[in-house]
Amino acid sequence: HPTPNKNAYAVLKFDFSGIDTSNEDRFRTSFSGKIQKAVRQFVALYRNLFPNADSFIQQLTEESPSIQSIQDAIDKAELADIKIFVIIDEYDHFANDLIAMGSQLGKNVYHNMVHANGLVRDFYEILKTGTKTVIDRIFITGISPVMLDDL
């Protein structure tokens, strides 16, 4: 039985499996790339809902850093009155990799990315802010609650 919300959301999906955790720069580049790709695919999939979608996708590719691209998409969705359902798959995959390294490097990268002003924390803060406007639902999958405690 369909719910009243059937087909009511545009789905923005992030998949954080396969992020390069070999060092902080590679992590940052890999994580940012995953965000950029997800946002571009989201806008492309729902291009009929976004005014000037093609130029917006080009702008996302050329001008917006990863975190800003999420905010830009949220802003455009708000203008177009698009409700968003966010799915985050493997939210903790990279955290588990970094912790499993068992090295000081792994601990440092984890701390720098997840704690205050870290890239991962900024990502979740933008999503949380988006819940005040167009992000109506968020579904997160992972295998352990380890990172949730640190956010």
Locate the predicted segments by residue.
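Phosphate-binding site recognition
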Residues: 1-151
